[in-house]
Structure formats: structure tokens, C-alpha cells
């Protein structure tokens, strides 16, 4: 159903009382402006105006303005009665099915869902940290949205509506029993509200409603019911318990044909057949996991798992996958930091370890780091020489761990942000790159990371000097990892599908796939010291390779950062506590973990080689996980597999490393993805109504996040009710004007690509409306610019100016306006993460938007060329020739994708490469990288490459690029190639080819030659490229929307191409809450 229709129905559902009037606001093309002004004037002439009067005025307007020249932009609701009280609507559900709070054994008091006043003595002790849903929408609106969704479903699918109603009754009855948790203005749940209610009530209501919205059949109903009931009491281990058996089950599907990655990184089908085999250990692991489910009273899952275990069936595996996905939706486990790090602090030190293995492990780390950095040091890489500048340019606006008051030329600011501290320190001559100690006297403050189904992790918030010390080295290691297939997390040009084909490629009946979850890795205290020492040794060796004093300094402070952290103290409950483990928070965390992880698995495999004869076919590390495939000369037997598994485990324990090591023949499960029966699965575990942490986003931004998360889950096999999602969007984008007045933006605002875009009219498909009407609307919306006084004041202050000047002078030989503007913009953008600035901008933007939505006539248009103008122009000379039904064959590589998408993928093929959307493949970008630490953005490259040859020379010169290089660049007319390359990247960027489903489709598929027909003539390559890509996306969109493959032909003449080419140089990108959440670019 159309969004606007749905929103109107929903409003009637909410405002179900007499005294309410609705006023529709329209946007019209310029020629009908006076009619719209007339309409607005006539309905604003009195105090309170009757609905019938408004309706007659509206009818008058609609008869004057033809349909294609107007669109509904908002609804204004005047509700004078008592708001349709949610509590009253819930009363009919009674309290018969209400759940009762109960205490759990062996958990901390706050982890129990018991009455809040039994956890905290009084208001002074109370905190909402451990139950805060952290989202700007309320339990009331969630209930309202659910009741409306059920009432809508009754019209079309009574059977499923009954299921939803049954589940919702549990939630409603529980609310009736304890009372509705009411939030304050900032959507926080305070002591007064919570003291007589179960502590986790709000988070539980949200997660339960989220799970109810996912119910589509009996199976999902059963999963959801069990989780809803059990998560009321168990707030700690539920997700883990329910998803534990998965690890074994992935190994229990035979492979009958699969997709593999070839030598030259392409995907191809292989008809290989491999039977599954699991070891005794794994069967025991499984029975243990099942036993735990039984103890917890989770009979439904236990039965289902056991049945499937006895006779594994590829066709019902998606049902297992659903349980696995659902289990994450019970919400985040939020612990007190002192409990979260308890394990790490109390790790016992064991000297009874295999020193041989430790020595090898340590040497491997040292050699890897040495190998990675050797050339860079010998060639005196720019980024090492200017390590400090390089780090300052990419200094984030994250916390520096301490709150300071800073005076920016009269603008006082209290902030913890790194960038502000650096600017202030430089101005007051306090700035230094010396590494501050992190001992008892200066313990490290901790941040947190909450994940469903796992313990809370602590994050170090280190002083910015640590970032400066590590930045350059970490960046180089990352760059190296991008070229090494072993590092599957960083390996460039690859996506998840390639890494998957990589695994299936080597599987056969002679091979064992070992996979290890190393997530407790950080905690095992052995890791830290040996890791830091290996790093230091590698660094000392690197130091011998050069006499460059700058590089020596860089290496020295890097070594110092390692020495300091080796014996670090952290701040917990205002006490300094010694903490040995690697916590994240360092720049190098990710890459170092991967290097150590690779060294670990190589060491263990090396040890196994003394017991068996085998070939290591591949090793991969991906974050906390590692996996390897080893091929034996003979077929694998159950006995061999069991022996191998227990040996693998014993070698890990000889190093005193707490890991979960497993081996199978056909499947594996790691944190990011799991492979079973030669198919690829992802966990659809993104929470929608509970967030991990609070940020500066408004409810409007959060609506966009909600939609983006809904799409991610849907692409991973968990479909939520779209009605429910749209109603949530309707609630969260509404703007309260006064107590009685609320404004609801409509689809033409929410789904148009402007700064206000929230969702797509058709899921998985980005539509760029291209009528005259929408282009005018878009131009008007573009004129709504957010301003922030605080930001402007900071930018005017002497501190800010001198900092930008310092960066400029250090970076460029002679001031280049393009570069200095770029730096200024970047630095100013970093200020946006400072809450008061973000809020000021948002508020400013919303005030203007509110007046726009009520009366668009007073706004001036911004003359801006957007992608819509380009597509509108193209639409003038293309024809749809024919359309045929999309063939029913599905690509089953990812069985959980929606059906239409699987058919589309089967037709066009899977994409294996990401496209360059940053312009980094251009020669210009490469030359600058060679001589400077500055990385120009795509917009900047785009601007420079289109300037005169002299400007290009000047641009290069300001980065000290040798004259010889510049001459070569110009004489070989490289800039002409670059124009094309950069524009190409820019177009990819504009058409968001890395969005949602588009990133799965092979846009270079030969199939498109049959469906996009060009006229043969001498053409402008850029224009042709643009038309071609736009039409390819149009074809894909049509497949998804209508289930048809269309053939499109282009009928343009030479002037059209030239005109389009000129247009392309002025196209501007649009940023919105939608694009912020939906675009996946690394």
C-alpha cells in the first residue's frame, strides 16, 4: 500500500475521537503558485476552522491544478481532544496472559528483570544505563504501531493477524499488569516511572514488538513466542544459548553443487559433491548446547534442533537460520563495565605453556610486521616521514577521555573531542607528540561496546598522542592487508561472496575445514605481553634500515606507545585497576589482531604437521575468527576427523589460549557469515527498536536508520512487516508544533532524494523522481541550509584559523585555495559531532522545514544540478522497447535473499568487485599519494581535473610534486584519461552502486548488452557511460519492482551527448539521513 494512504489510515486510527481536523498541504509547480497561496490564505483566516470548510477549499485547489503539477507534502493535524490513549486501547487485552518477573540465579542484580526498587535503593543510585533502549521513539508508539499493523493485517491475512494478536496479547497484558513505562522529553526512563516496574520492561516491550513484526507463519510464531516469554526473565544468556547449536549444524549439510571463486577472482558454478561428517567432539558439543536449552526450559528450540540433527535437510535449514537470526532480537546485553572486564582482570597466569609454540608465534608476528613495513622504511615513505601531519589530517572527533572547557575566541565550549583538544593545545603551545603514561596516576578511561548475545566489551579511550603514534604504521599495514588474501576482512576488491567462494573452492572429501572463534583472545593475558614484545622487536629491526631522523622519531614513539600499554591501568568505578589485555581503542587494534590471529593459526597448523601429512590449501583471518583448509592424501574418516579436532584443541590449550576450535568437511560459522551445504548465510540480527548507544540523532534521523536496518535484515532473510516499518517512519518523522498541532511529512518529502530523505518507495530500489514537479520540489528543499552559530564562531576563532593555517603550511609549498578550502571544510565538518552544534543545525533545519511543509510558496529555489536533472534529461531520448517476464530460476548462493532478488541475480550474475567511487584509481590521485600525505576527496579531484592545464600544474606544485613528473603527466595528456576515470567514480558515487541490493548484482554483466541498446555514432564516452549505467540500474529496478526484464534503447543525437556531458560537470551530491545509513563505502 502507498505510504500516503497508509499514513492517512494510521492517523484516523490514532486520532479516533471527535474533535480533530486534518489539513493537507501541497506543493505545486511555479505556474500554479497563486492558486496554492489562495488555498493557504483561505484556510488560515480564522482561529479554528471546520473540516468541511478545509475540504471544500482543498477540492477547489485540486480542480485548478492538474495531477502531475502537484503533490501532497504534509498533513497537519489539529487534535483538540484527549489523545487516543494507548493505555485505554490496551485494556481490552486484560492481564490474564501477563508475564511475571522473577529472579535469575548467578547474575548481577541489575541483570535481573525485577522491580527497579529492588535493584536500586533510591533515585540517587538509579541509572538507566543497563536497560536504555537508546532510541527516540516510545513504548506507547510501538504498541500503537503494532495494534494498527494487526488491524490492517486482518483485512488481508486473518490467519497471520491472529498469530500477531496472540503474541501482542502477552505484551499488552504485561503492560496492563505493571503499567506503561512513560519516557521523559529526551526519551529516557526515569526513576519515578520505573521504580514500581520491572527494570528491563521498556527494552523488553521494544524487542518483543520487533519480534512480533517478524512473524509470517507458524514457525516464526513459535520462535517469537518462546523468545518473548523467556526474555522477560533471562536478560543475559538467552541469545547465546539459542544460537550456540548453530556452529555444529552448519557442518551437517552435504554439498551438492556450489559456487567457487576461480584463480582470476571470478565466480563459477562447480558440480562438486561432498558428504558431511562431524566428529564425536562436535556431536558432544551439540548435545551440551541442547542440554543447556533444556535447563533453561526452551523445549521448542531443543526439539527442533534435535529433530533436524537426526535428519539434516537442506530445505528446512532456512528455518534453523531464522531461529539463529531471531535470537539476536532479544536486545542488547548491557553490563556494568566492572563486570564486563572482570574476566580479563582476573585471568590467571600460567607458566606451564608450550614455550616452543610461543617462540614460533612470537617470531611469526615479528617477521610479518617486519616484512610489511620493510620497503616503506627503506624507501623513506612520505607517510612515515610526516607521520604527525598524516595523523592530524585524519584525526577523528572521537573522545580524548577528558572533559575540558575551551574558549574559542569568546565561544566557550565544554568538550571531550580529540580534534578540539588538539586545536586548543596547539594554540596554547601545550601540544606535543610525546606519549603520556597510562599508569596508576593516569588510568585510561573506558568506553563500551554492547552486542546482543555477548558480554559487553571495554574500549580504551586513549589520549590523542597514541593515535598520532600509531596512525601511519597502522595505515600501511592495512594497505598491505588489502593485497593479501589471508586477511579476508581487508582484502580489497573482494566482497563477502568472493571470500565464500574461496572456502567452497577447496572443499572436498579429502579436506578438513578448521574454524576457530578467537573472541576470548584479547582476554588471555599471554597475548598482550608476547604481542607487544614482538611488535617492539620488529620495530627495533626496522630502525636499523634507515638513517632518516624523522622515521627514527616515528618508530620511537610507536615503540613507546607499546611499552606504555604493556603495563596499563584502567579507570573503573573511579579506581585505577591494572589491566593486561589488549582492549580496542588503539588505531592498530584491528590489524594487529589479524596479524596475531594469522600467526596463531600458522603456529598451530605447523605443530599439527608433525603429526599428520597434509597440505595447507588456505588460511584466512577475519576479525576475531580464523579458518583454514587442509588437504589430506586420503579421504577423511570419522576417526581421523575426531583425532584431528582433539589435537587441534590440545595445541591451542598448550598455548593457554581460550578458543572454540572446530573442524568439519562442508561448513563453518564465523561472526560475519556462515556457510552450510555450500551456500552462504548472514545473520539477520540488526536490532530495530533498541539501539546500542545514544547519539546526537533526532527521531527523524533515527527513522532513516530504522528503515536501513529493516532493509539489511530483509536482505539477510528476516522480513518484517512493511506496514509496521512505515508506521514507525510516520511516527518518528512527525514534528510536534504545539500541544494540539502535529505535522506529518508525506511520501513526496520522505522518499525524494533531498537532505530529508528517509526511505525508498519500493524496497531495495533507489528511485530518482524525474518529473518537472519533483525537480522543482528538490530545488526548493536544497535551499534549506542548516546553520550553526557555535560552529561559525569556532571557525572564526584564532585557534581554529591558526590550526588550519598550520596544516596548510605543513602540507603545501605555496597556498592553494582548493586545498585550503578543502582542509577548512573537513575541519569544520569534524565539529559536527559536537552535540550542541549538531543539535543547532538540526533545529535550524527543522524550523525551516516546518514552515516549508506548511507553506512552500515563500521559499526560493536553489539552482543546483542533481542526478535527477541528468536522469530527466536522459529520459527524453530513451524508449522502452519490450518487456518479458523475469525467468523463474533462482540463484541459490544466498538462499535467504528475497525471491525476486534471487531471480534477478540468476539472470545477471553476482558481482565480485566493488567499483572505485573515490577516484583513487586515477593517476592524479596516485601521484599526490606518492609525494604527500594529503588525500583529496572525489569532489576535489573532480574540480581540479577540469581546470586549465596551468591550474593542474599549480595544484601538483603545491604538493612539491617534481617538475619532471608534472611534465610527463601533462605531455602524455593523462588528465584526459583522469577526467574520464574521476567522472566515472563520481557517477558510481551519484548512482550509489554500493547500496543494498545493487552491491550484489554484476553491473558489468554481458546480459545488459541485450537490454540496453545504443545508437552507433561518434559519441562522448562520459555521456555514454552515464546513460549506460543509469539504464542498467533502470533495468534492474524494473526486475525488482515488476518482475519483468525490459529492453531499453537510446535515441540521442550528438548535441544531446554534448549537453549531457556539460551537465555532468555540475552535478552535486545529496546527503541525507538516508544516505548516511544506507551507503556502504569502505
From Swiss-Prot:
Cofactor: Mg(2+)
Domain of life: Viruses
Catalytic activity annotation: RNA(n) + a ribonucleoside 5'-triphosphate = RNA(n+1) + diphosphate
GO cellular component: virion component
Residue ranges occupied by any RdRp catalytic domain in the UniProt entry: 498-670
EC identifiers of the protein: 2.7.7.48
GO molecular function: nucleotide binding; RNA binding; RNA-directed RNA polymerase activity
Keywords in alphabetical order: Magnesium, Nucleotide-binding, Nucleotidyltransferase, RNA-binding, RNA-directed RNA polymerase, Transferase, Viral RNA replication, Virion
Compartments reported by the entry: Virion
InterPro entries: DNA/RNA_pol_sf, RNA-dir_pol_4-hel_dom, RNA-dir_pol_luteovirus, RNA-dir_pol_reovirus, Rotavirus_VP1_C
Coarse class of the protein's main subcellular location: virion
GO biological process: DNA-templated transcription; viral genome replication
Family classification: Belongs to the reoviridae RNA-directed RNA polymerase family.
Record function comment: RNA-directed RNA polymerase that is involved in both transcription and genome replication. Together with VP3 capping enzyme, forms an enzyme complex positioned near the channels situated at each of the five-fold vertices of the core. Following infection, the outermost layer of the virus is lost, leaving a double-layered particle (DLP) made up of the core and VP6 shell. VP1 then catalyzes the transcription of fully conservative plus-strand genomic RNAs that are extruded through the DLP's channels into the cytoplasm where they function as mRNAs for translation of viral proteins.
Subunit-level organization: Interacts with VP3 (Potential). Interacts with VP2; this interaction activates VP1. Interacts with NSP5; this interaction is probably necessary for the formation of functional virus factories. Interacts with NSP2; this interaction is weak.
Name this polypeptide is given: RNA-directed RNA polymerase
